[in-house]
Amino acid sequence: MARKWLNLFAGAALSFAVAGNALADEGKITVFAAASLTNAMQDIATQFKKEKGVDVVSSFASSSTLARQIEAGAPADLFISADQKWMDYAVDKKAIDTATRQTLLGNSLVVVAPKASVQKDFTIDSKTNWTSLLNGGRLAVGDPEHVPAGIYAKEALQKLGAWDTLSPKLAPAEDVRGALALVERNEAPLGIVYGSDAVASKGVKVVATFPEDSHKKVEYPVAVVEGHNNATVKAFYDYLKGPQAAEIFKRYGFTIK
């Protein structure tokens, strides 16, 4: 009996080893992910490599930039957008395997100041005196024309009646991490970023959080790029929805959907 169980365990171990080698043999996975996912995705890629032996290479930028690159045929296997709009765009261009689309994460929209700033916490509402808070400086934000964080920010500021006052005072960046960097370098007294960006940065502090009802929910849809739904990509896609990845995402301030 003991020999029988030993043989079963040995067979199971061999099966797992063969499965792991099969994934490794299929090569690396390329992920196009919103800039705000940089730290979390790097940690997840490292963990996946340890567990499965497969390299995950990520390209981080504004979701708009990534969606257009995928449309143009860039060699991405997975796309994670920081909003539904740019995933919709990729779907409309028939660049996405729509059966794999799923909302993976949520986030918050916050205002940050340099870590050493004397700026105190404040409440964001229709009476917020942004001109006084900026004190002659500019408000760092992802470009509201195409960057999801900037689009969320514009929507919130419009709803709160502050957009007309603030639009001439913006310092637009190519993506949300660019806006974060302006505040980290003390080139802007305040910036609008995601809560997860503030968690990932040692150079800023959160001084205010936008009311949830002031903007659409911050959501991160994930999907496999059309024609790339092989076993290795599917394994990482499933891993992103699993407990190991969830723990890392939560550590960086994301909410799990």
Swiss-Prot record:
Any one cellular-component term (Gene Ontology): membrane
Signal peptide: 1-24
Highest taxon of source: Bacteria
Phenotype upon changing S36A: Loss of chromate removal from a buffered solution
One GO process term, biological-process aspect: molybdate ion transport
Record-linked CDD domains: PBP2_EcModA
GO molecular function terms listed in the Swiss-Prot or TrEMBL record: ABC-type molybdate transporter activity; molybdate ion binding; molybdenum ion binding; tungstate binding
Practical uses of the protein: May be useful in radiopharmaceutical applications as an engineered disulfide bond-containing protein with increased affinity for perrhenate. May be used to remove chromate, which is toxic to many biological systems, from environmental aqueous solutions.
Effect of a null allele: Cells are unable to transport molybdate unless high levels of it is supplied in the culture medium.
Subcellular location: Periplasm
Binding site for molybdate: S36, S63, A149, V176, Y194
Protein keywords: Chromate resistance, Metal-binding, Molybdenum, Periplasm, Signal, Transport, Tungsten
Gene3D superfamilies reported for this sequence: Periplasmic binding protein-like II
Upregulating conditions: Expression is up-regulated by molybdate limitation. Repressed by molybdate-bound ModE.
Subunit structure as annotated in this protein's UniProt entry: The complex is composed of two ATP-binding proteins (ModC), two transmembrane proteins (ModB) and a solute-binding protein (ModA).
The family this protein is said to belong to: Belongs to the bacterial solute-binding protein ModA family.
Role: Part of the ABC transporter complex ModABC involved in the transport of molybdenum into the cell. Binds molybdate with high affinity in vitro and with a similar affinity in vivo. Binds tungstate with high affinity in vitro. Binds unnatural anion perrhenate with high affinity in vitro. Does not bind sulfate, phosphate, arsenate, selenate, chlorate, metavanadate, nitrate, perchlorate, permanganate or carbonate.
Name of the protein described by the UniProt record: Molybdate-binding protein ModA
